[in-house]
Structures are given as C-alpha cells and as structure tokens.
Design a protein with these regions (language model features):
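Short S/T/G/P-rich N-terminal loop/turn motif that feeds into the first structured element of a domain
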Residues: 1-50, 54-68, 75-93
Length: 93
C-alpha cells in the first residue's frame, strides 16, 4: 500500500526547489525510484511538496540522498515529514 508524505518546510523559494531538483537530476537520483507522484505547489517564495510513495522503505532510501541537497540549498525542515499510511491512489488520466 502506498504512503503519502508531506514535507514541513516553509519559505522555500522556487529557486531553492529548482536547485535541489536539478542537483538530484544531475546525480541520477531524479525522479526517485518508488515515487509514484510528486506535487510541488504554492507561490514562488513558499513552495510546498507532497509525494506518494510505493513504500516507506523507498522513501527513506531517497531521504538519504535528499537531505544533503536540502542542506546545500539552505532549506531547513521544521521537523520530520508527515507520513500517512495506507493511501489509495486512483489514476484517472
């Protein structure tokens, strides 16, 4: 069963978000294995991210690659991401 993850970051700029994504892409870590859906939204000075993952293990594995990129871009999380178990995903496209 999938999990939903919401990241507790605020005041993340679009530039910071793009930097992290570009660095992960350059390292061959984007898109991450096991991520079913990635949604980045909000105004350019307050980007929020939510994701749906196949398993918690795949999310944790990606977290080991993500953390250094967040730190390098100056993004600080206000705690651990919220994780919701047993998410049902319906694809309508």
């Amino acid at each position: 069963m999938s999990i939903l993850v919401r990241f507790p970051a605020s005041n993340v700029s679009k530039q910071q978000y793009d930097t992290v994504r570009d660095n992960l892409t350059g390292a061959g870590d984007w898109p991450p294995d096991g991520c079913e859906l990635h949604v980045a939204f909000g105004p350019d000075d307050d980007i929020r991210v939510s994701e749906v993952w196949q398993t918690a293990d795949k999310f944790r594995s990606f977290g080991d690659k993500l953390r250094p990129q967040l730190e390098q871009a100056g993004i600080q999380l206000a705690g651990e991401p919220e994780v919701f178990d047993d998410v049902h995903v319906v694809e309508t496209l």
